[in-house]
Amino acid sequence: MEPDDARGLKWQGGTPPGAAALRAAPSFGAAASQVRAATLGNGLRVILWSEHKIPNVALYNWVHVGSRNEGVGTSGLAHFFEHMMFNGTPRHPQGDFDRLMEAQGGSNNAWTSQDVTVYQDWFPSRALELALELEADRVANLLLVPEVVENERKVVYSERRLRVDDSNAATLEEQVQALAFLAHPYRIPVIGWPSDILSWTMGDLRGFHSTYYAPNNCTLILVGDIDPDEGLALVDKHFGATPARSAPPPVRTREPEQQGERRLLLPRVGKNPLVQYAYHAIAATDPREPALNLLQTILVGGDAARLNRALVEEQRLAVAVGGGWPQGFDANLFHVQATLPAGQDTARFEAAFDREMDRLLQQGVDAAELRRAKNIAAADFWRGICTIDGKARLLGEYAVMHGDHRRLFAAPEAYEAVTREDVLAAARAVFNPRQRTVGVLRPLEPSA
């Protein structure tokens, strides 16, 4: 272990696990030495990766709060703060953040999930200090002005109406998610329930920001044209004075084992029947993660995926089949969603789907399917890691969701090492028909 830095920053050095075995990409293994990780005295985790090919920087601030941290009456607050964080501080009034970043040639974005809220900034390296000052300022000193809150409340409520309430697929998915989880807060929609959006109080907002927007609840990623020592000194300059706060309350609830299939029938105006399946899966830190990710590609990853070939191209029982598994701090759901042709019998589709899943659980996958999935995973990985934005995103994912940024450098070999037996074991662990929730949307004709 390396000694603490002179400024009291705890360096986390050492060789990333598995990096030496990346013989197919030795330059990537060597790149691990360019990554530096430190923890400020106030608990802020900082990870920096020097990449000098272009004079730009990508900054990701991962705030460890999502809808899983919300409760009765406060659903949607994590997503709401994604909006509010661009609305000013005493030092930088509303609009300053975007104006100052754009003047330097920079841009920004943000997104919220069930587990995290992530703020992204991209800018020329000459604007590094400005970006850090703006980011630190809004984390510590965000203004909550009642008129601005009400305006953003209307925006978020309209967003919910557009993205969820007016969408048959999104409405069905929201209700399936809520039915699949009896206890765990993954049942809460990220955007929030309508009544909660309309009733948050200023006290709710202040308490939420004070609890979760603290340096010891954030992970800051910097990738690009930066010197690690200079970059860390600037992070300490702008973030270091913000005091740590009490650790947020942990999410202790674990979903009880599902004892039998649950079903939901949703009559809605529309043309196409929809069928959605939700199976209880695993957490991102589970060692079976590579196998389940590859299985996801085999089942629903593209036109050549197994379910698309069988149910769309060959049997023509669906016009589209998709799905996925959102990796989270806790075990989330593996979703499979199908859009059926107008007039299609959903029972006929379900019988065919069950036959395909039975075949998977009995026979597993063949070598060609697994090879295709590995090729896709490798191509996606290297395509992402070749940009500073991809590096920043992946560093954050591994640091926050997988528990250690160094696992990133072992990811290619971890995926390549997956066997057909590993995939079959993951399939049997997840695709248990007794532990699934099925939602069926039956289309209705519009009323006259």
Describe each PLM feature range.
Residues 49, 54-80, 94-139, 170-195, ...:
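M16 family metallopeptidases and their MPP-like homologs
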Residues 51, 62, 161, 178, ...:
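His/Glu-based metal-binding/catalytic segments typifying zinc-dependent metallopeptidases
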Residues 77-85, 295:
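Active-site His/Glu-centered metal-binding helix of metallohydrolases
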Residues 87-91, 139-147, 365-366:
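Short, polar/flexible loop-turn hinges at active-site or ligand-entry regions and domain interfaces
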Residues 424-440:
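Bilobed periplasmic-binding protein-like "clamshell/Venus-flytrap" ligand-binding domains
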